[in-house]
Amino acid sequence: MGSTSSFNRRDLVKRAAALGIIAVPAMGTLSACATGGGGGNDGNDGNDGKGAKNKGATSAKNPLGVKKGAALEAFIFKGGLGDQYAKDAEADYDKTYGVTVKHTGTQQVGPKLQPRFAGGNPPDIIDNSGADHLDMNKLSAQGQLQDLTELLDAPSLDDPKKKVRDTLYPSTLEKGKHKDAFDVFYYAFTVYGTWYSHKLLKDKGWAYPTSFDDMIKLCGDIKKTGVAPWTYPGKYPYYVHFNMFAQIAKIGGLDKWIAIDNLEPRAWTSNDAVKQVVEHYAELAAKGYFLQGSQGLTHIQSQTAWTRGKAVFIPNGSWVENEAAPTTPKDFDMAVGPLFNGGSGDKMPHGTLRAEPSEPFIVAKDGKNPVGGMELLRILLSKKHAQNFATKVRSLTAVKGATEGMRLSPGLSSAAEAVTAGGRNLLMIQLQEWYPKLTDEKLGGLTSQLLTGDMKAAEWIKKAQQYADEFAKDDSVTKFHREA
């Protein structure tokens, strides 16, 4: 995603078919748990349910019971966000616990770690992003992930009177669950949407559209200037889903989107918003509003075309500012806009935004030092390191208000403003996280054909429902459910 989530690729953003416990790239793509009580002061070396094994004595300064001098190993996805932010947190861990964290930065998380999980010797903490990420759903179902409830209930580093959970965006607590276990910690907070150059729009006298109709009209005006209105990474068409799925939820309402997340019968075909949104994308394609050749571009290539002024809009996540930095002009003034209005019948207001946790961290229950892995996360969740993350990689974290008072880069500033303006109308889409093979491979294939004009909207919807039904009936696919 950033990150990505897998989709670099990412979170969240990023994915591909899951085979075994590794998510394998599809279509040339780039990106439970224990139960029981917590630790204590008894220096327990066993795994007492949700509490991590190999604990030392706890104290006010060491609430999780990290053993000083105990080795800690971290595998960090080194994609669009890099891994320096993690190294910085590891340096503080080193100073506190008298050990040098063994650090590996890689884009091959799954291929490197799948055999280690199978062999029972995984690293302690993993940033599980990128196209070649581990299948967390399967790992959770196999009981290989540490339940992180103990971390959530620990005192925060900045204010011991406040629990870690109370410093986080609520969606972080929701998204990290697998049934009754909280075993995935999404560290970043990604804003998905339509990205553009504020300077370009201002110089041309164009206004960011508020509705589908406004967008179609503006695209016509843009095309007349010889510039493409849109581009996208056609080799990874699921990037388009970042916007498409959220638009469906914005227009049709969250309840109807939740039915799609839950793989309910007729969830796609009975939702009028699906028809309206998919037809909008079909219209963009029919009128030639996508940059010629976009269907063959990678995420980096499409971003480069965009930053070089060949296209005005691109669907992406807030990691794009950091990832596209090498080709972005200094005066580009990167910005992100909210979802578009479909009409007077929209269930959610203008300003609605897809903004959700990304960059998934997991702690291996069978690692040598899972409690140390949780402590490294606690350090990362301090204001110091949340701000360091924002400064180094131009992205928000799961820590509420961590960037207040900071001077932010243009893209990050725009994303933060959009989150504030969205208020309670921030959407979280689970389908891409729960069923990546469905969304990235199956639906991604449909979207690829839709955007080249080789598939009609009605056929896209029909086949999307067909694929969703197949997944719903497949007993080999772990199912998830959400109420809100």
What are these regions (language model features)?
Residues 1-11, 18-32:
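N-terminal secretory signal peptides
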Residues 54-64, 134-191, 243:
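Hinge/lid segment of periplasmic solute-binding proteins
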Residues 68-79, 99-104, 125:
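Short, well-ordered beta-strand elements
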Residues 91, 119, 203-204, 287, ...:
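Extracytoplasmic/periplasmic substrate-recognition and gating elements
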Residues 91-168, 199-207, 312-313, 329, ...:
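Extracytoplasmic "Venus flytrap"/periplasmic binding protein-like
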Residues 174-187, 192, 216-266:
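Extracytoplasmic/periplasmic solute-binding protein
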Residues 177, 186, 415-470:
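C-terminal capping/gating helix-and-loop segments adjacent to ligand/active sites or protein-protein/ligand interfaces
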Residues 219-222, 262-294:
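Glycine-centered hinge/linker elements that transmit conformational signals in sensory
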